[in-house]
Amino acid sequence: MSAAAGTVSVMASFAVRLVHGPGWDAARPIRAQDAWDQHAVFMDGLVDDGFIVAGGPVGAGEETLHLVEAADENEIRSRLAEDPWALGGLLLIGTIEPWALWLDARRAGSARR
């Protein structure tokens, strides 16, 4: 609850797909991309904050899928825009979709609710 506003911030779950941008060097593995260390520290911070619940490359690694908890799409765009890889054009937001999590090990019995 925000003391100043007297409101409770409601978080929703989202599936966020990130795609390679023009700054991505296809000849280099993921951890050899420019600013890998800065990107990793930034993403770890988002996990520590509870913003990113889970995530990582999918398929052949051309895309990354994240389970994100946020107030809305604007918060997602704003926070991910600060990623060093976003600033360097390595990753772009592909899609952001609301995700109704009916099965969630973090919430016992979630499918029955």
Language model features with spans:
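Conserved, structured core segments of small domains
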Residues: 2-113
